[in-house]
Amino acid sequence: MLNRATMDMLTAMKMSAMAAEFANQLKDPAFNELGFEERLGMLVNAEWNRRQCNKLDRFIRNAQFAVPSATVEGIEYHEDRKLDKAQILRFATCKYIDEGHHIILKGASGNGKTYIACALGNAACRRFKKVQYIRMPELLDELSIARSGGTLKKVLESYKKKDLLILDEWLIRPLSPQESYDMLEIVEARCQKSMIFCTQYQSEGWYTRIDPNPESDSPVSEAIMDRIIHNAYEVLVDGRVSMRERKGLKAAREGGGQDV
C-alpha cells in the first residue's frame, strides 16, 4: 500500500520515469541486494534522462528545422562535394557559437546546404543551445508584418536571444531598401551571436543583392557585410550530382530500380 502511494505521488509530481523505475525495482528481487543510495541513484538517473530527452525534443521542435532529422553523422562526404570532415566535426562541438563566429555555406541549389545547416543546428540543440531556423523570404515577411503592427522591436529581441540563427536561402533575391535596413537590424541585433547562412552566391556578389541599385553608394551593404564576412567560416558545398538526385538514385537502387 505504501509503495502504491509512493508511485502515485511520483506520478502526481510528474516524475513518471522515476515512478516506472521504482515499479521495476519492486518487481525484481535482485534490486533487494543493492543499497539504498544505489537504488535511489538509479531512480534519479531515470528521471534525469527522461527530462533531458524531453528538453532536447523541445529545443529541436522550437528550432523549426526544415530537416528535423538531420544529424552530423548523416552528412555524406562524397569526393565531389569537397567537404572537410574534420572541419564539420569541429563545427559540431559548437565552439564557433561560444566564440560568436558565423558559418557561410555556399553552393548550388540541391547540394545539401540545408541539411548540413540543420545538422549543425541539431548538434547545437544537443548542447542545449537555443536555435532558430528560418528561410530568408519568411523572415522578411515576418519583419514587414511586425513593422506594420508595431511589434518590430519585440521580434528583433526574440531573434537576439537565440544562440544560433540559421538563415536559409540567404539573398535568394535582391532586397528592397527597406528589406536591407531590416536585415541590418537583424545582423546588428545578433552582434556577437552566431549565424549560419545558406546561399547560392559568393560573398563578393552580396553587395549588389543587398543594394541592387548600381548608382547607389549605400552604407547599408557595407555595414551588413562588415558584420558578417570578417567573422565567418566560409564553406563550399560542391557536387557534380545534386543531393536530391543522389538520394533519388539511391532510393531507386534500393527499391529494385535500374542500376545507374
Question: Which residues fall in each region the model found?
Answer:
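Charged, compositionally biased N-terminal leader segments and the immediate start
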Residues: 1-19
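Conserved P-loop
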Residues: 83-161, 207, 254
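Extended interfacial segments that mediate partner engagement and assembly in macromolecular machines
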Residues: 53-106
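Conserved phosphate/pyrophosphate-binding and hydrolysis machinery centered on Walker-type P-loop NTPases
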Residues: 12, 29-34, 65, 77-81, ...
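Short, well-ordered alpha-helix to beta-strand connector turns
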Residues: 162-163, 232
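Interdomain "pre-motor" coupling segment immediately N-terminal to P-loop NTPase/helicase cores
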Residues: 16-68
